């Protein structure tokens, strides 16, 4: 019987060891263009073949898919021949002169030109054979796997875009799915910038006209959520991907994104600093208000964030956020820090040591009384170590020792050498 393979946990199969991730993504994109779509067995055979081909690196530096095709054994199982054939066919298109903007634009790295796929099995849109298309929301394992692939890439970078394009091509998400994916992968600042650029692109597309778009049926975003509107869904996906190209600072966050509210700084002063920095640092034509609202909450100190969360104003107009945080000032914080714990009142009973009222026995400055009379003189007012009679006896014994006769040194040496007197 043939081998069976369980469904992969990661929606994007892992690259073979020794193969660069961008080369592996090219193989995956070619595999997803197969008709009918690739099976798990095809991916297994592709990984198995590439592990062997890496040991013969003549096709890697530079990469040459024609040489790689010659390394495929005859009657090799799976569809590795077809995948490599697609790569050979598309290689000239990706190496075209600069007149081809799709291949040379750093914001749009290869993928290959997307083609409509018929009756393909993809998620969250399901196309079961002989049944209408159905929608299935994202599963957390899918989102986690995609985020793991782009964790080391900045939003909008070539590596980030290549992975996201592959995920969109594989899963065929709706407009709502793309919104959820953006919120999961990117910060609130990046999501706000992307949303503004996407709204501009959608308005232009609706004005110019899109095949299959009906203005009477609602906005493009609503129509793209219909599982049966595959053409409009593809158009919306392209607009969603294109919106990443307008993100300022794809490699690192701009300077104004690092402005934080100090622990003692009033919220109004912090917002004013943000406003000035955005006026001086935002690219021309970029809307300022959504970025200012996003940073006013995300970069505020913990006290102000708690106030905004309690009132449900994390993304409210800036005036409402300022009024909400007026209840917190550094003076209020100092008052809270000056509150001291209540001290325990002194006892009403006399102290066990000195007999006075007003303090506890553990705080008494008088020495602790002895538990009983002195065993030497029977005096109950002192300890044995402080007995004057004991000190007198010790002094008398020392005086007696001083009165004893002392032998001369030569006599003592003579006794020691002879072993003592007879």
UniProtKB/Swiss-Prot annotation:
**An annotated Gene Ontology molecular function:** zinc ion binding
Give me the residues lipidated as N-myristoyl glycine.
2
Q: Does the keyword Disulfide bond apply?
A: no
Modification note = Specific enzymatic cleavages by the viral protease yield mature proteins. The polyprotein is cleaved during and after budding, this process is termed maturation.
Entry keyword set: Capsid protein, Host-virus interaction, Lipoprotein, Metal-binding, Myristate, Phosphoprotein, Repeat, Viral nucleoprotein, Virion, Zinc, Zinc-finger
Task: State where composition is biased (Basic and acidic residues).
Answer: 388-398
Regions crossing the membrane: none
Question: Carries keyword Cell division?
Answer: no
PPXY motif (motif): residue ranges: 109-112
What residues correspond to the site Cleavage?
Answer: 123-124, 337-338
Instruction: Indicate which residues form the motif PTAP/PSAP motif.
Output: 98-101
One GO term (biological process): viral translational frameshifting
Provide the domain comment: Late-budding domains (L domains) are short sequence motifs essential for viral particle release. They can occur individually or in close proximity within structural proteins. They interacts with sorting cellular proteins of the multivesicular body (MVB) pathway. Most of these proteins are class E vacuolar protein sorting factors belonging to ESCRT-I, ESCRT-II or ESCRT-III complexes.
UniProt-listed PANTHER family:
ENDOGENOUS RETROVIRUS GROUP K MEMBER 24 GAG POLYPROTEIN-RELATED, IGE-BINDING PROTEIN
Record's function text: Matrix protein p19 targets Gag, Gag-Pro and Gag-Pro-Pol polyproteins to the plasma membrane via a multipartite membrane binding signal, that includes its myristoylated N-terminus. Also mediates nuclear localization of the preintegration complex.
How it assembles, according to the record, is: Interacts with human TSG101. This interaction is essential for budding and release of viral particles.
> Which protein, by its recorded name, is this?
Gag polyprotein
